[in-house]
Design a protein with these regions (language model features):
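Conserved small/polar residues in nucleotide/adenosyl-binding loops
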Residues: 282-284
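Conserved helicase ATPase core of P-loop NTP-dependent helicases/translocases
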Residues: 160-181
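Post-DEXD/H (motif II) to motif III coupling segment of the RecA-like Helicase ATP-binding lobe
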Residues: 60-110
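Conserved segment of the helicase C-terminal RecA-like domain
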Residues: 213-248
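Conserved ATPase-coupling elements of RecA-like P-loop NTPase cores
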Residues: 35-38, 59-71, 189-192
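Conserved strand-helix element at the start of the C-terminal RecA-like helicase core
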Residues: 84-85, 125-145
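Inter-Walker segment of RecA-like/P-loop motor cores
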Residues: 3-37
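Conserved RecA-like helicase motor core of SF1/SF2 enzymes
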Residues: 177, 183-227
Length: 284
């Protein structure tokens, strides 16, 4: 908004917007150009080298599915003058081992996040997000909210960028006061939310069905409140409240440090099974 759309490019697995005059690039870690010699390659006029490189949410290096990409960027992504890695404090101990010469700093949340207990869907305050897992459950809750409360926007990772952005705009402009979403709202979206309610704390993570970890709950609950505006979180629709110690950890932003990052060689040998096994995912 400050620089204008002609100065900023966007690359994700779904979108590629590269204005000819762009000098700033926002992208997912999987899509970002790494290495000083890597060109964008589409004639958009973007530089091959970047003065500044920032990687956000580096705690995801501990995620089994995407972690190896974040670890690769931690090891190899560098700006000419400055490189910044942003994320949860839980990643700091491992980052200190990997980057012994880096300077570390921290910023406290400017607003208070507090637990508001359990509320029925019909009793949730306006400007709330209701978080569920599974397409059917999200649409079922959204339809109920539309009938009982007058309207709801829907945000899921599997929506097309255009549809997802339209739903976010619908909520942000105040056309509806409720948002029903998956944990896709936990990262990459800054929304004017006063309250986040979990309708479920169980998700399928690609390998198994499990409960959310306290850190994952905090990532979602932390969408409530913005800047100096306090926020609340709770449960709804039959979801059991978290344990008291989990609530306390979320309110105080206090979690166990990540013990392992995932790593995979960027030079995978597809010539033999032995070569693939030797370069398979490992913990570091």
């Amino acid at each position: 908004a400050k620089l204008g759309p002609s100065k900023v490019g966007l690359i994700t697995g779904e979108e590629r917007i590269l204005p000819p005059g762009a000098r700033y690039l926002c992208c997912t870690v999987e899509s970002m150009p790494v290495g000083f010699s890597m060109a964008i390659g589409d004639g958009a006029g973007l530089p091959k080298r970047f003065d500044f490189v920032a990687v956000d949410e580096v705690q995801l290096a501990g995620d089994r599915e995407r972690g190896h990409v974040f670890t690769d960027r931690i090891l190899h992504a560098r700006g000419i003058h400055e490189t910044m890695f942003l994320g949860a404090e839980t990643a700091a101990p491992l980052l200190r081992q990997m980057l012994p010469d880096a300077r570390f700093g921290s910023r406290q949340r400017m607003s208070v996040l507090s637990f508001a207990g359990s509320k029925k869907l019909t009793r949730l305050p306006r400007r709330s997000a209701i978080v569920a897992f599974g397409t059917a459950e999200v649409y079922q809750i959204a339809e109920f909210v539309r009938r009982q409360r007058g309207g709801a926007a829907v945000v899921m990772g599997r929506l097309s960028p255009r549809t997802r952005n339209a739903q976010v705009e619908l909520y942000q402009k105040g056309d509806v006061d409720f948002l029903v979403a998956t944990d896709a709202i936990g990262m990459g979206l800054n929304l004017d939310l006063n309250h986040v309610a979990l309708a479920s704390d169980i998700k399928f993570d690609g390998r198994k069905t499990r409960r959310l970890t306290p850190a994952e709950m905090a990532q979602i609950a932390g969408r409530a409140g913005r800047h100096t505006n306090d926020g609340t979180f709770g449960v709804t629709d039959g979801c059991e409240p978290p344990e008291p110690e989990v609530i306390e950890a979320i309110e105080e932003h206090r979690f166990e440090p990540i013990r392992n990052f995932w790593w995979r060689s960027r030079d995978i040998d597809f010539g033999s099974v032995d070569g693939l096994l030797a370069l398979s995912l490992i913990h570091i």
